[in-house]
A protein has these predicted regions:
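Conserved alpha-helical scaffold segments that buttress catalytic/binding sites
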Residues: 2-6, 14-308
């Protein structure tokens, strides 16, 4: 299947074994939103080219639509593709990103954003905060992205979580896979009370449980370069695909949004990292559906009893 037109709904037929969005209010719509910008990248450009590459992998005949839990987009939940935002490396780009997230949340959809570099997480979370208040964040990355202003740029892709924490958009930040924690960022960790699971200490059990509302941000350079060569910043000694999937599978808290960022197609090998990003989209979307909305625990429990 080719990439969908803007606001195309991928599949709306009911599943015989699991309630649909219309009849239960639990299986929801996930809205894909491309944020093709890398203006705040500090080393290499390229992530702006990623959203259509991720879509091509997602809809490719190389795989199918199922997540590992058994839920399939187009069968068990609706996947809307809002296309790529018309970003122009101008001051208004953050406002365009925020407006798109506002629109998704207002429509009852859960936004799943395709970067782009990691700087996009800040405007995304500004809109998430307006709808859900301060969130808990699971941030998977090689880098803490807590610089006050890398190279004098406070909007650098190395600084989004400093802006997020300063603005009070998160009540808790848990960072997993970190392996580049220098003196400045150690001070920022202490300042903001960040919970860090460094790569050298990683096990799935080391990742704490989360409460709703939860936002998940996955920087593909959190993976070992052997799993994700298509990133700008290779940092050896990282997470495997299975380790990250195990972390996601343990999450029970309702998820109000997510992003997958920092794919650089210019560095990828045979589409390996694009396929990884596409798999993460399927796994995140299915986890959003299975964990249900923030405010309907009883309904969610009944519906999930009928799902795989």
């Amino acid at each position: 299947m080719g990439a969908c037109a803007p606001l195309d709904t991928v599949g709306n037929e009911p599943d015989n074994g699991c309630s649909t969005a219309e009849d239960s209010g639990v299986v929801r719509t996930i809205r894909l939103i491309g944020a093709p910008t890398d203006i705040n990248s500090s080393f290499l450009r390229g992530p702006a080219k990623a959203p259509p590459v991720i879509r091509a992998a997602l809809y490719s005949d190389m795989g199918n639509r199922a997540a590992e839990c058994g839920l399939e987009f187009g069968r068990d939940y609706l996947l809307e593709d809002a296309g790529d935002l018309p970003l122009s490396e101008a001051a208004g780009d953050d406002e365009r990103i925020t407006a798109a997230i506002h629109a998704a949340c207002s429509a009852g959809a859960v936004p799943l954003v395709l970067g782009g570099d990691h700087a996009i997480s800040y405007p995304v979370l500004q809109a998430i905060h307006a709808h859900h208040g301060a969130v808990e964040i699971l941030h998977i990355d090689a880098h803490p992205d807590l610089y006050h202003a890398l190279d004098g740029n406070p909007r650098s892709h190395a600084s989004p979580f400093a802006r997020i924490m300063e603005a009070g958009l998160a009540r808790r930040l848990v960072q997993v896979g970190i392996r580049t924690l220098n003196a400045e960022q150690r001070a920022q960790v202490a300042r903001f009370g960040v919970e860090v699971v460094p790569m050298r200490d990683f096990t799935p059990d080391a990742v704490p449980p989360f409460a709703a509302p939860l936002y998940i941000s996955i920087d593909l350079d959190g993976f070992d370069p052997a799993c994700a060569p298509g990133v700008s910043h290779h940092e050896p000694g990282g997470l495997t695909t299975r380790q990250v999937l195990d972390v996601l599978a343990r999450i029970a808290a309702p998820i109000v949004g997510a992003d997958v960022v920092e794919l650089n197609p210019l560095r990828d090998l045979n589409g390996m990292t694009a396929m990884l990003a596409a798999k993460l989209v399927k796994e995140l979307a299915a986890r959003m559906v299975r964990n249900g909305p923030v405010a309907a625990p009883d309904t969610r429990k009944r519906a999930m009893a009928n799902c795989p």
